[in-house]
Amino acid sequence: MKKWINILLLAIAMMACENTTFVSSVPSYPVQMVINILGEYPNFVAEGGINVLTFTAPRYPTEAVGYAGLLIYTAFDNQYHACDLCCPKCLKRSAPVEWDGGFYAHCPTCGEDYDLSYGLGIPTRGISNERLRPYTALYGNGRLTISQQ
């Protein structure tokens, strides 16, 4: 009897576990880009404030820019961040989010604004319930490497 109670409790505990891994609704496409910050974009520095680079197409045959393109930016944490230009609510490659010149990326289709200031790309208006699809941004030796997470 004690054995069955333990098995039942274990089964209940396993069913109560929830997978909390973030899965984006934006389709997974290859992402690979290496940017020579010092040589190509010397003013794109991660020092206090938001700076943005966008790429809707690869610059070289060896690069890949995700589903709708890359939004590469710096945030208040003085780190480099990257995400896909596709709005996770609309999923339109032909209408990527656009940087507003301040702290937000705006979707021209649904009107959602995504906050870039803390490096998360989170929705602010409640239209979308999902952040922009994040990518890994690693900086070292003057080079910024963007890849899948």
Language-model region placement:
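Short metal-binding segments enriched for Cys and/or His
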Residues: 114-125
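Flexible, solvent-exposed short loops/turns enriched in glycine
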Residues: 100, 105-108
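Sec-dependent signal peptide recognition
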Residues: 2-10
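N-terminal pre-ligand scaffold of iron-sulfur
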Residues: 20-100, 118, 133-149
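Short Cys/His-rich metal-coordination motifs, predominantly Zn2+-binding knuckles/fingers
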Residues: 89-90, 109-112
